[in-house]
């Protein structure tokens, strides 16, 4: 299993980032829409993340929309030299807070410029193409050549340093890599949902980061009970155990747990110090059986 202390790093494009980062989605209002309940708390969470050593923040201009990026800029600009801000394009928000695909060339280009403006940047570190085929929940097969080529063109223009993918299949990863190199893949993955095991291993062999989201998503009651029991035996929270398992799963996994609470932020960061024994790992791995 991979080493994972809070000092452990992995490459994300041209940067080495710590494996425990921060996901900014929850800084917006309910349903990731509108302003936060308490803007001061949102600013405090971001500044505390940096003080705890976070140098990888995941965001998007469709969080809010615009709200989360504007909060990041207010809290942290001018940004620390070692901070990697990763954003994503390919979706937009309806007036009812719905999530809608935004895959046309014009929409993709506008999204990059919106991210640049609201983050206060001249160049974006990493932009992921968020794929929303099917019902938008979970990857669905389909060609991404046209939309990914638009992102690759923006990279060639110098607006984006590195590019990646989100919510994709292994076939779509292969299709994209024929067009341009990617530095990361973001998909749902956790102890109970391990459909990307082969993809993670393949990406590790290529030096490409894998960034899982929803570390506690989709657990059955039995799986949740098992995880809670393990956590109690370790004097840890279920989230800490879930994050520690991911860190030990593979060295190319980068985490972006999100929260709007300073207390939960500190708990999440402490997961980097939680070492799971072989016996504990066997119990957790059995949850996927």
Model regions and ranges:
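Active-site mouth loops of central-metabolism enzymes
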Residues: 27-40, 95-106, 135-140
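Acidic (Asp/Glu)-rich catalytic clusters
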Residues: 73-84, 117-120, 177-178, 200-205
């Amino acid at each position: 299993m991979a080493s994972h202390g809070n000092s452990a790093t992995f490459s994300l494009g041209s940067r080495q980032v710590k494996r425990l980062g921060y996901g900014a989605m929850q800084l917006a209002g309910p349903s990731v829409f509108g302003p936060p309940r308490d803007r001061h708390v949102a600013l405090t969470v971001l500044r505390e993340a940096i003080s705890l050593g976070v140098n990888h923040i995941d965001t998007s201009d469709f969080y809010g929309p615009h709200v989360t990026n504007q909060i990041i800029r207010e809290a942290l600009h001018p940004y620390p030299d070692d901070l990697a801000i990763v954003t994503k394009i390919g979706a937009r928000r309806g007036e009812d807070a719905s999530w809608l695909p935004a895959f046309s060339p014009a929409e993709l280009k506008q999204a990059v410029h919106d991210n640049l403006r609201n983050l206060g940047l001249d160049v974006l570190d990493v932009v992921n193409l968020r794929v929303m085929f099917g019902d938008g929940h979970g990857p669905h097969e389909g060609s991404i050549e046209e939309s990914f080529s638009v992102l690759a063109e923006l990279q060639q223009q110098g607006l984006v340093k590195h590019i990646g993918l989100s919510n994709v299949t292994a076939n779509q990863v292969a299709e994209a890599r024929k067009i341009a190199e990617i530095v990361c893949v973001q998909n749902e993955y956790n102890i109970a949902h391990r459909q990307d095991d082969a993809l993670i291993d393949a990406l590790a062999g290529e030096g490409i980061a894998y960034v899982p989201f929803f570390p506690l998503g989709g657990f059955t009651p039995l799986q949740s009970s098992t995880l809670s029991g393990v956590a109690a035996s370790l004097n840890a929270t279920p989230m800490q155990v879930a994050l520690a398992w991911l860190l030990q799963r593979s060295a190319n996994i980068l985490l972006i747990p999100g929260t709007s609470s300073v207390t939960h932020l500190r708990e999440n960061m402490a997961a980097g110090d939680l070492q799971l024994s072989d016996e504990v790992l066997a119990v957790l791995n059995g949850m996927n059986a």
